[in-house]
């Protein structure tokens, strides 16, 4: 289960490894917050987010 409640509060901070604002990850090293838009399954977990769109540049 997602340790953050970004979808409910719009913001979160998970142990220094993940910081969200308006449910958009600015730093995502673990499956803490959704990096890509909902429905982008390839970015659902274990991602390092590079962008906010669901395409090949989204995750690395």
Swiss-Prot record:
Source taxon at top rank: Eukaryota
Pfam families, per this entry? Metallothio (PF00131)
Instruction: Name the segments for region: Beta.
Output: 1-28
The record's keywords, sorted A to Z, are: Metal-binding, Metal-thiolate cluster
Q: Which residues bind a divalent metal cation 3?
A: 14, 18, 23, 28
Identify the residues that bind a divalent metal cation 4. 32-33, 43, 47
In which family does this protein belong, per the annotation?
Belongs to the metallothionein superfamily. Type 1 family.
Under what name is this protein listed? Metallothionein B
């Amino acid at each position: 289960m997602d340790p953050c409640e970004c979808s409910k509060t719009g913001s979160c901070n998970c142990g220094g490894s993940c910081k969200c604002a308006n449910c958009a990850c600015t730093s995502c090293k673990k499956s803490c917050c959704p990096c890509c838009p909902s429905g982008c399954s390839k970015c659902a977990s274990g991602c390092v987010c590079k962008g906010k769109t669901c395409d090949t540049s989204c995750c690395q």
